[in-house]
């Protein structure tokens, strides 16, 4: 997961929204070896993206994918796209591993947040979960801001929000090392 997040942070423009980044992640993990992807309508509704054209337009504008027209018949709901950046697909783990990763990205244990949470919150929780060992996590502050597409102050605000909403038990920034450390809340 970390590798895919890093590749996406590298190829997507810095100004890409959290929504577009979450969408790009699902596309990268669900694409076939030719870069073709179909995101079903149910998945898009679950991600709260059904009917939202802006994140797709962002990814098209970045020349990362091209949306393809889909049929309107029964069973044809969703969006089909062709990924244009084949580097995102290489090296491609087995399809079953990518499918599990795509599902985990929707519910990143141990830092899962509500599906109704704003995209920046969901993306940051996912990035933190990908950098969390069983009882603690840490990452370079600059890496986190790059992966989340946020400024340091925005990231600090989200860490504080995770404390208030009981997603995290604690966090601190080691200014000398440039690292952020956190501890997920243990649920019983």
Name each model-derived stretch:
Residues 1-26, 99-130:
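Short alpha-helical segments that sit at the start of domains
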Residues 1-2, 37, 91, 95, ...:
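A generic structural signal for ordered alpha-helices
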Residues 4, 10, 19, 70-72, ...:
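Residue-identity detector for threonine
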Residues 16-18, 77, 96, 151-153:
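Generic serine detector
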Residues 30-74, 133-184:
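Winged helix-turn-helix DNA-binding recognition segment
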Residues 72, 93-94, 118, 155:
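Alpha-helix capping and helix-coil boundary motifs
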Residues 80-116, 183-188:
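Short, amphipathic alpha-helical interaction segments positioned at domain boundaries
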């Amino acid at each position: 997961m970390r590798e895919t997040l890093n590749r996406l942070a590298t190829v997507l423009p810095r100004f890409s929204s959290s929504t577009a980044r979450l969408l790009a992640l699902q596309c990268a993990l669900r694409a076939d070896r030719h870069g073709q992807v179909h995101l079903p309508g149910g998945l898009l509704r679950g991600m709260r993206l059904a009917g939202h054209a802006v994140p797709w337009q962002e990814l098209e504008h970045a020349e990362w994918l091209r949306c393809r027209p889909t049929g309107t018949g029964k069973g044809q709901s969703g969006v089909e796209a062709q990924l244009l950046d084949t580097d995102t697909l290489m090296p491609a783990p087995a399809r079953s591993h990518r499918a599990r990763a795509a599902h985990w990205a929707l519910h990143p244990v141990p830092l899962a947040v509500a599906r109704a949470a704003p995209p920046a919150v969901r993306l940051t929780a996912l990035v933190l979960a990908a950098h969390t060992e069983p009882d603690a996590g840490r990452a370079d502050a600059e890496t986190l801001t790059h992966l989340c597409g946020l400024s340091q102050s925005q990231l600090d605000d989200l860490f504080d929000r995770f404390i208030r909403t009981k997603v995290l038990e604690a966090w601190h920034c080691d200014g000398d090392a440039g690292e952020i450390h956190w501890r997920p809340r243990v649920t019983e």
